[in-house]
Structure formats: C-alpha cells, structure tokens
Amino acid sequence: MILATTSSTCATLGEMVTVLSIDGGGIKGIIPAIILEFLEGQLQEVDNNADARLADYFDVIGGTSTGGLLTAMITTPNENNRPFAAAKDIVPFYFEHGPHIFNYSGSILGPMYDGKYLLQVLQEKLGETRVHQALTEVAISSFDIKTNKPVIFTKSNLAESPQLDAKMYDICYSTAAAPIYFPPHYFVTHTSNGDRYEFNLVDGGVATVGDPALLSLSVATKLAQVDPKFASIKSLDYKQMLLLSLGTGTNSEFDKTYTAQETAKWGPLRWMLAIQQMTNAASSYMTDYYISTVFQARHSQNNYLRVQENALTGTTTEMDDASEANMELLVQVGETLLKKPVSKDSPETYEEALKRFAKLLSDRKKLRANKASY
C-alpha cells in the first residue's frame, strides 16, 4: 500500500493508534532490521533528535519468532529507561551471535540446534526485565504445546492475566523455538498472591504463521479501550490505525507451482517439506490481503504499509543460514528493497513511503504531546 498524507488523516492524527508488526523468519530478520534502521534514522532527522527511538513513536510493537526478538530489543529498557538497543544495533547483533545460535548440534533425533547459546545471550542482553517494564505495548506470540493454545504476551493483559508477566528472555526464546530447529521452552511464573503457572512453549509462528499483523491490530484495539491516553477515542476503527508491517522475505521459488500429476506421487516426507513453505507463503499473503481489504473498505488504505521482499533466491531463503556471506546478502536484500516500488501501480519506493511514514509518526507524537500539555 502507498502511504499518503490526507486531510482526514491529519485531522485525526493525534488520536491515531500506531502499530509496528514484524514477521518471523530466523536469520532473515536482518531484512526488517535494515528497514527499522532506516525508519529510526528518518525519525531522528525529522525531529532533530539523535536519541529518538522507535518505541517513542509506536503504541504497539508486535513480533513473532525473530520478529519477537526485534520487538524485545527495541522495547526493553536499559538502566536509563531507554531502549537497550537502537535499530542500528540489530544487524550487528545478528552478525555477532547468528553463527553461534545456528550452530548445528549434530543430533539426528533431536532438534537441529540445542538453543543453549540463544538462551544465554538473551539472558545476558535482557536480564531480569519483565513484560510490564516494556517501554511501549508489546505483542509477542508463542504456543503452549501442553494446553494446545496460543499464548500472547502483552502489557494490557496483565491486569486479568498476571501470570503472563514473564521475563523477556523467556518470552523471546519461546517465540523463537521453532519445532525442528530449537527445543521447546519450559519456565514457571508466580503471581503476587503465590499462584504458580507453568509454560511449555514453542515458536510463535505456530500461532500466527509468521505474520503477527492481525494480532498486533487486535492488541491495539484492546489497548485503546483500557489506556487513559486514548480516552477521547469512543469507538476505534481502522481509520484511527496506522500500521507498518515488515516481512522477512518470501521464496520466489514458491511461485514455480506444482502440477497435480507431479504431486500425486509425493510421499509424506516430500509433502511435509513443501506444505510448511506453502502454508507460510499463503498465510502471509492472505493476512496482507485481508488487512488491505479491510483498510480499503474503511477508506483508510493510506494508513497501512506492508514492506516485503517477494523474490528471495538461493541461500537467502533459508532461515538458519548464518554464514557471513549469506548475512551480507540479506543486508543487500534489505537495502535494495528500500529502492523498490511499493506497488506495480506507483513509482513511489519503500524509502519514500517510509519517509512519509516517519513524518506522520513525528506529527502524531507532537500533536499528542501538545494535547497532553493542556
């Protein structure tokens, strides 16, 4: 979608709920990290503030799998109550830790990676920080294999579900614990009245199939109902939403299609390998299609921007290839994506659309600050 400033948008900008959603995709998280770095740089330039951070501008930041990790990095506070990581720190994080995270365990019967290094680095970076301390509302998904239900970690749910005030490193590992790749994660939380809760969690993509945009919008809707700063919003609809959704790239080889004659001879293993790829691609497409349709039906299509590379090839399609050569290729994918047109119908590039998005975010922040001062 092409983001544009309209008179109706400006009229209600101060009351808009801003949402950032980041897909899952393992090491391919480098692609949205490049986009986030560009956007944060634009916000710093527009507001003439080198300390400006994404968490200052978005009411809700949601992510699944590697998107959940990015969410935690830009919302978890440091000792100065500022995000412990700037957007420009994310790509170096992948380069430093990616090869150790995706270091084959050598196990034939167990998961491909033991997850020990991932959990260790998350503990070191995120410390004892819990959900309630996040600098803005978060929406990080996981799936409990014991209860067979999704688990959504958000600040706005804590009043009714205090057991969800887990440590951020437990949440981040859980949302990244993709079956086959990493072991499930078990941890326990205790509420203030002494109740004990157990969690047996795997990758959030099981709950959201990689794209948490709809989840993030749902959390934003609830936030507008319970947060006093949105008291002037009587009935939230998509006209009052500003959504930026970042993908981790799709495999262009998925588009080669298969014939009925070819697949008729496939066995369970061949289908198992192909169907996950098909499901992820189809789900991401349908999520984007649904959101686009709903925003358009509300005459708010300019409030939604999906940034996605749809032509990944070779090693860049792999979520666990953390070789330096492949990570460099993923950086190039992200940088090239910024120069590509948002749609076939317009010459506007993602870079130009994100600059416009940054201006809207800045204006919205200033309008809300001015309103709060009266």
From Swiss-Prot:
Transmembrane segments: none annotated. A motif (DGA/G) lies at residues 203-205. The active site is at residues 65, 203. It is found in: Vacuole. It holds the Pfam family Patatin. Keywords: Coiled coil, Glycoprotein, Hydrolase, Lipid degradation, Lipid metabolism, Plant defense, Signal, Storage protein, Vacuole. A motif (GXGXXG) lies at residues 24-29. Glycans are attached at residue 103. GO terms for biological process: defense response; lipid catabolic process. GO terms for cellular component: vacuole. One of its GO terms (molecular function) is nutrient reservoir activity. Belongs to the patatin family. The nitrogen atoms of the two glycine residues in the GGXR motif define the oxyanion hole, and stabilize the oxyanion that forms during the nucleophilic attack by the catalytic serine during substrate cleavage. Patatin have a dual role as a somatic storage protein and as an enzyme involved in host resistance. This is Patatin-2-Kuras 4. It comes from Solanum tuberosum (Potato). The gene is pat2-k4.
